Design a protein with these regions (language model features):
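Short, solvent-exposed loop/turn segments at secondary-structure junctions
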Residues: 18-20, 46, 57-61, 132-136
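Acidic, metal/cofactor-coordinating or nucleic-acid-engaging core segments within structured domains
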Residues: 59-127
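Extended hydrophobic secondary-structure segments that form protein cores and membrane-embedded regions
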Residues: 53-55, 126-133
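Short, solvent-exposed loop/turn segments that connect beta-strands within catalytic domains
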Residues: 45-49, 119-122
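Active-site metal-binding core of divalent-cation-utilizing nuclease and nuclease-like domains
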Residues: 5-47
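Polybasic (Lys/Arg-rich)
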Residues: 132, 141-190
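A short acidic (Asp/Glu
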Residues: 64-66, 110, 136-145
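Conserved catalytic cores of phosphodiester-cleaving nucleases, focusing on short active-site segments
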Residues: 39-43, 50-60, 109
Length: 190
């Protein structure tokens, strides 16, 4: 992001996680004890620099387990409480929805993007969560638990993968890719 600020896309994006999120566990890597984002796009609209974090979900299921512990509170509580995007829960951060999946992952991505903005690498961000329409349980969890905790809901959107990629329909250059994605992901969700 800081090497080529005019054009940027990254997969499994992580950025300054140790300094900004205190994610310094031994053996940490993207997705394991280290916040990562499936796709990060850097874009410009006028004079403004935008981040577009995209998290793809297909068949994941979660058990609703509270992941609150002292280390996570030390890392994330102050970021949640000072967040301009996330509401502070009425009964405090500990044992809140922010420590239950899928909100836990989305919270971490949100505070990482806020840190990128606060350190002037971008001006704002628009968060996308790609979930098949037929994955009711996951969509419902995000819609009913995470989205209500956002200060500005207009900067977070759930897309069905077919909807997101629909502009590519009919373009023969992408026929094989779309066929693969449909068979591999959204065609198989029950």
């Amino acid at each position: 992001i800081d090497e080529d600020p005019e054009s940027y896309i990254s997969f499994e994006f992580a950025f300054h996680n140790i300094e900004w999120l205190k994610e310094d566990d031994e053996g940490s890597r993207r997705g394991t004890m280290c916040t990562s984002i499936d796709v990060m796009i850097f874009a410009r609209k006028g004079n403004r620099k935008w981040l577009i974090p995209i998290e793809w979900k297909y068949t994941e299921t979660y058990n609703g387990k509270d992941k609150t512990n002292a280390k996570r509170m030390d890392r994330y509580a102050h970021l949640i409480e000072s967040s301009k995007r996330l509401k502070t829960p009425e009964h405090g951060v500990a044992h809140s929805i922010y420590f239950v999946e899928p909100s836990y992952e989305l919270m971490r991505q949100t505070v990482l993007c806020e840190q990128i903005v606060s350190h002037k690498f971008a001006d704002d961000f628009f968060h996308i969560n790609v979930i098949p329409r037929r994955h009711y349980e996951l969509r419902n969890a995000v819609e009913k638990e995470f989205i209500p905790m956002l200060e500005d809901k207009s900067k977070f959107k759930i897309f069905d993968p077919e909807e997101l990629l629909s502009p590519l329909n009919g373009n023969m250059a992408y026929d094989e890719l779309l066929k693969y994605l449909k068979e591999r992901y959204w065609g198989s969700v029950k």
